[in-house]
Amino acid sequence: MLTERQELILKTIIMDFTQTHEPVGSKTVMNQLPVKVSSATVRNEMAVLEEKGLLEKTHSSSGRIPSTAGYRYYLDHLINPVKIPTSVYNQIVYQLDRPFQQVNEIVQEAAKILSDLTNYTAFAAGPETHSVKVTGFRIVPLSSHQVMAILVTDDGNVKNQIYTLPHHTNGEEIEKAVRLINDQLVGKSLSSINEVLLKRIADHLIARGSAPEILDLLQDVIKDAASEQMYVDGQINLLSNYENDDLTKIKSLYKLIDQNDALSSLIGFNPEDELKNDSSSKVQVKLGSELPSDLLENYSLLTAQYSVGKYGKGTIALLGPTNMPYSQMIGLLEYFRNELAKKLLDYYGRFK
């Protein structure tokens, strides 16, 4: 652990550097410290912090910048989230205070709001679908070989997919299959629709001479409804953190955040990784070296979970440069996760 003075100096350097993005010298630190300390003392303490691996010296300046270890110490022991300004509060309330037709629309808007407010890349995943129940399934013929499968759940979401059947299936056959499927599925939660239940439905369909392709499209639309949808906004902001023109890296980074499975793994929230200081923050921060891809070595990922009661939990996240102003960003995520949860609870309340 550091002495109280060393902690003050480290915190001052990090807060100044994340605002100016310029190396911080001893005179700047001396002028910003809340206690009177000589420039020589500050220089000596900065040298100690550098020896401990918490500060780094740049080639172009006599000032210091935080190292990854310095940021981690700051995040674990020193940070105090900042309350968001009234203007930001008003913008969040305004953008969320409009009618939405589906949960996914709210979650998608959440990612956009966070990206607009921060100029970083933002992610948002909706509440888990484990408790969501099926309220109806339909198949609508579009042509002699093409149909649309529609699955409706009790949270107001509608999933639909278009399928091409290998042979003509008449309307009466489709209606019989739909009635049988609804008898088996309506009122069931998505998480309870397992292979055993689907096999029972398949046996009934085969016994009645229904096309086996109907079961395939049912499985596809259920899988789609149960899968976690991750919304991303502000991908272009990733480019601002690249100082060179390495197009290969940029393309790989874009590909990484365009893969839903990779994103779910990256954004996955672990309560044990919440900030360990006294701020009681529910925001998790991972620095570049702590992230699973070398492409993210100059980035930090801030993740927060929000709860919508019995409807489950969702996740919001920000991906930005390591030298971001953490106090402001953590304060923003803390407030935003609560506002998003309230908006979703209001939405779900319409279906009681």
Swiss-Prot record:
Keyword Transcription on entry: yes
Swiss-Prot/TrEMBL keywords: Repressor, Stress response, Transcription, Transcription regulation
UniProt keyword Transmembrane helix, yes or no: no
Highest rank taxon of the organism: Bacteria
GO MF annotations in UniProt: DNA binding
Membership in a protein family: Belongs to the HrcA family.
HAMAP family reported for this sequence: HrcA
PANTHER family given in the database record: HEAT-INDUCIBLE TRANSCRIPTION REPRESSOR HRCA
Function: Negative regulator of class I heat shock genes (grpE-dnaK-dnaJ and groELS operons). Prevents heat-shock induction of these operons.
Record-given protein name: Heat-inducible transcription repressor HrcA
Gene designation per UniProt: hrcA
